[in-house]
Amino acid sequence: MTKVYANSIQQERVVDRIALLERCLDPSNSLPTAKRLVAVAVATILAVALLVVAGLLFSGVLCSPVSVLAASLFFGVGAFLLGGALVGGVLTTEAVTRERLHRSQTLMWNNLCCKTAEVEQKISTASANAKSNDKTRKLGE
């Protein structure tokens, strides 16, 4: 009797794990993270580029405006392009990491399904044994 109860508790835990894995495997759950990452990266690029341009423009106003203005635009555009390359690298790394995570979760899912099938087989075997024991008891009485 206690084995059947323990098996039902184990089966409930397996069902909870399956539900958790289904939520993890849902690709729509990872989209907000990528969107937030893009927004933060673009804001950082713009802030760095604008700070470089503003600093150089301020020094250009104090010194010689034409040459420093050209330099500030050059450095601002350079900072923006460098930031864009950095963000591209970060997003590529994030996409690869998410893909690897999804693949490992899929493997975990397959492993869990195999374990669940084994648990269900053990439970059905235990219930069949319990039924046969009940039949033998009835015959013995």
Swiss-Prot record:
InterPro entries: IncD. The keyword Nucleotide-binding does not apply. It is a multi-pass membrane protein. It is found in: Secreted; Host vacuole, Host pathogen-containing vacuole, Host pathogen-containing vacuole membrane. The lineage of its organism: Bacteria, Pseudomonadati, Chlamydiota, Chlamydiia, Chlamydiales. Inclusion membrane protein probably involved in early modification events of the chlamydial inclusion. Its main location: secreted. It comes from the Bacteria. Keywords: Host membrane, Membrane, Secreted, Transmembrane, Transmembrane helix, Virulence. GO terms for cellular component: extracellular region; host cell membrane; pathogen-containing vacuole membrane. The chain crosses the membrane at residues 38-58, 68-88. This is Inclusion membrane protein D.
